[in-house]
UniProtKB/Swiss-Prot annotation:
Keywords tagged on the record: ATP-binding, Autophagy, Kinase, Nucleotide-binding, Phosphoprotein, Protein transport, Serine/threonine-protein kinase, Transferase, Transport
Limits of the Protein kinase domain: 14-307
Function: Serine/threonine protein kinase involved in the cytoplasm to vacuole transport (Cvt) and found to be essential in autophagy, where it is required for the formation of autophagosomes. Involved in the clearance of protein aggregates which cannot be efficiently cleared by the proteasome. Required for selective autophagic degradation of the nucleus (nucleophagy) as well as for mitophagy which contributes to regulate mitochondrial quantity and quality by eliminating the mitochondria to a basal level to fulfill cellular energy requirements and preventing excess ROS production.
GO CC aspect terms: Atg1/ULK1 kinase complex; autophagosome; cytoplasm; cytosol; fungal-type vacuole membrane; nucleus; phagophore assembly site; phagophore assembly site membrane
Quaternary structure note: Homodimer. Component of the atg1 kinase complex composed of at least atg1, atg13, atg17 and atg101. Interacts directly with atg13.
Protein name: Serine/threonine-protein kinase atg1
Modified residues (Phosphoserine): 346
SUPFAM superfamilies linked: Protein kinase-like (PK-like)
GO biological process: autophagosome assembly; macroautophagy; mitophagy; piecemeal microautophagy of the nucleus; protein transport; regulation of autophagy; response to starvation; reticulophagy
Length: 830
């Protein structure tokens, strides 16, 4: 039985009725018990797609839910293993999740089955939910957390998407569940998704990075060990969103999110024009403390006025009136809280918008939802249509995901914000309803290959020493600066390097490495696949493919001064990521779709140039992570000094973070396009997005790996604090070097093709500085001046065009000469 394509099938005593949600490795169905007719939801997980980590999370979720029964926790009714599937039969929550409830709070009047809520509890002007609803949901969430605390459990992923809603309980239900708190005349909240939950003793500390960054405690974002108080920060973020209508802190990535949290210095801002009760403000401020020691504890939270004060049940509607109203709620919910990396999908034959009860109900009532009516994350203005700011929505097609992973929805995740080998991080769960990253911060092994071209690029920079950007870092944790040395990590020589095999340094004394480059290759110990050269093959290539080939297949032999190497590359080949017979931009595509792909290709070229600059610096770091030199190593293979190692790591770190920012721009553009277009994503678009997702995963994992190196090495060697390392400065100066080298080579009459490639790469690097809101540190020079950058790009482009015209003329002249020679030779032969 193929559950992924069939409905009205049976699983034990349950009948599957319709699909209500879909993720990269799980599908959620609405169903019912054949005998009792109880409506339930069935989460069907295809086990072969799960990595070891994800399977452990699933088993943990099952074991936890089997042991707990609470009125404000989603009930696990049954667990059935059938072939390749594990089916979790769970309580069905017909009102969807709290995130959509908050988002559509002003539209309840247009939905007969929900209009009763706004009769007595209208939303606050220019804020969030009605105060009574805020207190009601907070009390029910507190009840669920208090129950978990009694079982020594920490949820680790408290957010609106994991808080599901049911219609108000009946009198019979209340008699069966004396634990119920709050008002019986309001929707009932239930905590769901225990995929990241774990047992944690009061004195224990955890260190795994998981959950959704918008609601994640800063100690987790800083990779510090944390305890159950991390959930309290998440509660504060949820409480703020209920009261205000939006999260307390928003950012395009987790690094910028932490920077904004730190910049706030525990000062929580509330909208001046909205009235929010002082009791609620006080509790929010007590929960949203950066330092866990300053944060209110569980006893303080459970005894707070907001949680303990009984609600006023005064209502113009009786209990029977409410029950009559909610009887009409029969639209299936597609709440993302059931699936860790969720992407909604419409049912075949009965298309419906994703997003659960509320969004579907709007369509059922004939309500037209315009982009301007939806609040969401910022989208660059270049992607907006009709002057409206568009929401950030998950953009990853579920079918395009490789095998499973634990990594945006951004997205997932942006995330989003989607997978391959069992340990590879991807961005499928990033962008999960704008909560864009779900990762484990420990270095993870993967078979994904590093580019050999990056092994030699920039080796001319003082051998193995870092670029002369001596600067450092004073604690500003952002894409422009490296992380703070606030705690130690395990010794880096024992770390597993991302995308490398453990213990990859061979002990064979006959393996002689004469340069750091060959030592690095020895460390990688991987076979890579060739990428077709830009001139090979008669097939028509897209700009994205050409850009990738330019930046990879020729990077090593063109960009590096005085060094060539015809090694292989690890960037996705046509066989692996881009279909062999597909040209990404096809003439038959609609103009809007073609424009989208043009934008994606442009961003891909800019992102790829920054990514490889980061790869070069990472390649110089790897050989120094070995504890001792190997037989046959030369002086050039001598490890870097701790200071040089940390400086190189900082430079590589900020470049990977910049690459992540560029990739997020692409995700935002796709989200904006889909929000304003009724077109379905073409296979070409899905392939392009898949490439962005995989690159996002790689950059994120490597940046985290470098962060651990920086912290551990700085702590181990007591390195002095230096000035912040600027990604913009690194990119700017490298672009200048490339353009100067290309101009010098051109004047010397050297390889014209190599000069062209250097010009192109320099232009892409400079263009990346103009993409999105990329700020530079105070005091930055011309690299912070967009006018200067645009002028440089214009000059480089002009030089490139002149050189191309010279090449064309030279080719024509050569052909003429050859033709004349043949004509002259013909009579002689005769």
């Amino acid at each position: 039985m193929n559950l992924q394509t069939s409905t009205n099938q049976t699983i034990g005593p349950y009948v599957i009725r319709s699909e209500i949600g879909r993720g990269s490795f799980a599908i959620v169905y609405k169903g019912k018990h054949t005998e009792t007719n109880r409506v339930i939801s069935i989460k069907s997980v295809l086990t072969k797609k799960l990595t070891k980590k994800l399977l452990e999370n699933l088993e943990s979720e099952i074991s936890i839910l089997k042991e707990i029964r609470h009125v404000h926790v989603v009930e696990l009714i049954d667990c059935i293993k059938a072939g390749r599937f594990i089916h979790l039969v769970m309580e069905y929550c017909s009102l969807g999740d709290l995130s959509y409830f908050i988002r559509k709070r002003e539209k309840f009047n247009s939905i007969p089955s929900l209009a009763w809520i706004n009769i007595d509890h209208p939303p606050v002007y220019k804020a969030g939910l009605n105060e009574t609803l805020v207190r009601h949901f907070t009390q029910q969430l507190a009840s669920a957390l208090q129950f978990l605390r009694s079982r020594s459990l920490i949820h680790r992923d408290v957010k609106p998407q994991n808080l599901l809603l049911q219609p108000p309980p009946t009198a019979a239900y209340l008699e069966e569940h004396p634990q119920f708190v709050g008002s019986p005349k309001l929707p009932m909240l239930k905590l769901a998704d225990f995929g990241f939950a774990r047992y944690l003793q009061t004195s224990s500390m955890a260190e795994t990075l998981c959950g959704s960054p918008l609601y994640m405690a800063p100690e987790i974002l800083r990779y510090e060990k944390y305890d159950a108080k991390a959930d309290l920060w998440s509660v504060g973020a949820v409480l703020y969103e209920m009261a205000v209508g939006k999260p307390p802190f928003k950012a395009p990535n987790h690094v910028e999110l932490l920077r904004r949290i730190q910049k706030a210095k525990d000062v929580i801002k509330f909208p001046e024009e909205a009235f929010i009760h002082p009791d609620i403000k006080t509790l929010i401020c007590a929960l949203l403390k950066q330092n866990p020691a300053d944060r209110i504890d569980y006893d303080g939270f459970f005894s707070s006025i907001v949680v303990t004060t009984p609600l006023d049940d005064a209502s113009t509607l009786t209990g029977s009136d409410i029950q009559d109203a909610v009887k009409e709620i029969n639209i299936p919910s597609s709440s993302p809280a059931y699936i860790t990396d969720f992407f909604p999908k419409s049912n075949p034959g009965a298309p419906a918008p994703p997003g659960g009860l509320l969004r579907q109900a709007f369509q059922a009532q004939g309500s037209s939802i315009q982009p301007s009516e939806i609040t969401g994350r910022r989208v660059p203005h270049r992607y907006a249509q009709d002057g409206n700011t568009l929401p950030y929505t998950p953009v990853f097609p579920p079918e395009s995901a490789p095998a499973a992973s634990i990594f945006p929805p951004r997205l997932t995740s942006k995330q989003p914000i989607p997978m391959a080998s069992p340990a590879k991080l991807t961005s499928d769960t990033s962008n999960k309803s704008s909560a864009y990253v779900v990762v484990d911060h420990h270095p993870i092994i993967s078979s994904t290959q590093l580019s050999n071209e990056s092994l030699t690029h920039e080796q001319s920079i003082n051998g193995n020493s870092p670029s002369p950007n001596e600067g450092v870092f004073q604690g500003s944790f952002s894409p422009e600066s490296a992380p703070v040395n606030n705690h130690a990590f395990p010794h880096t020589s024992r770390m597993q390097i991302p995308y490398m095999k453990p213990n990859a340094f061979p002990s064979n004394p006959t393996y002689i490495a004469s340069t750091p480059v060959t030592q690095l290759r020895r460390a990688f110990e991987q076979a890579t696949a060739h990428v077709p050269q830009s001139g090979g093959g008669a097939r028509n290539k897209s700009a994205l493919e050409r850009a990738l080939n330019v930046a990879n297949a020729r990077l090593n032999e063109v960009v590096v001064d005085g060094m060539t190497d015809n090694g292989n590359t690890s960037l996705p080949t046509k066989e692996s990521n881009l279909d062999n017979n597909v040209n990404i931009i096809q003439p038959s595509l609609p103009d809007t779709g073609k424009r989208l792909l043009d934008v994606l290709e442009s961003i891909a070229m800019k992102s790829n140039s920054v990514y490889h600059l980061a790869e070069v610096k990472l390649a110089q770091i790897i050989p120094s992570l070995s504890d001792e030199m190997k037989p046959g190593d030369t002086l050039l293979d001598r490890p870097l000094t701790p200071f040089s190692l940390v400086m190189l790591a900082k430079e590589s770190y900020v470049l990977y973070e910049r690459d992540i920012e560029l990739l997020q721009v692409a995700f935002d553009g796709v989200a904006a396009f889909w929000a304003n277009s009724e077109e379905r994503a073409s296979p070409d678009c899905q392939q392009a997005i898949e490439w962005f997702r995989q690159r996002y995963s790689e950059s994120l994992e490597k940046s985290q790996f470098l962060r651990e190196i920086i912290i551990s090495q700085s702590a181990a060697h007591s390195l002095p604090t230096t000035k912040p390392v600027s990604a913009s400065q690194l990119i700017y100066h490298r672009a200048l070097d490339l353009s100067r080298n290309a101009a010098t080579s051109e004047l010397s009459g050297n390889d014209a093709q190599a000069c062209l490639q250097n010009y192109r790469l320099a232009a892409h690097l400079l263009e990346s500085l103009l993409e999105s809101n990329f700020s530079t540190p105070d005091g930055a020079n011309d690299s912070n001046n967009s006018v200067t950058i645009r002028n440089l790009i214009a000059l480089i482009t002009k030089r490139q065009e002149l050189l191309q015209s010279k090449q064309i003329q030279a080719n024509v002249a050569n052909k003429v000469t050859e033709s004349v020679a043949k004509i002259t030779l013909a009579p002689n032969l005769a």
